[in-house]
Swiss-Prot record:
GO terms for cellular component: large ribosomal subunit. Pfam families: Ribosomal_L32p (PF01783). The lineage of its organism: Bacteria, Bacillati, Cyanobacteriota, Cyanophyceae, Synechococcales. GO terms for molecular function: structural constituent of ribosome. Residues 1-21 are annotated as: Disordered. GO terms for biological process: translation. This is Large ribosomal subunit protein bL32. Belongs to the bacterial ribosomal protein bL32 family. Disulfide bonds: none annotated. Transmembrane segments: none annotated. Residues 1-20 have a biased composition (Basic residues). Keywords: Ribonucleoprotein, Ribosomal protein.
Amino acid sequence: MAVPKKKKSKSKRNHRHAVWKGKAAIAAQKAISLGKSVLTGKAQGFVYPIEEEEEE
């Protein structure tokens, strides 16, 4: 005979949800910070190819 599984408590569900949301918030903050540094030209971790005009 089929027996229903034990139900997990709401506090465990809420804790998992909070951890997941926290990780997403940290990732979003890093992405915004990286975008700001690239836009202002202060990014240290990127190497951009410099396009030089050739004079003939």
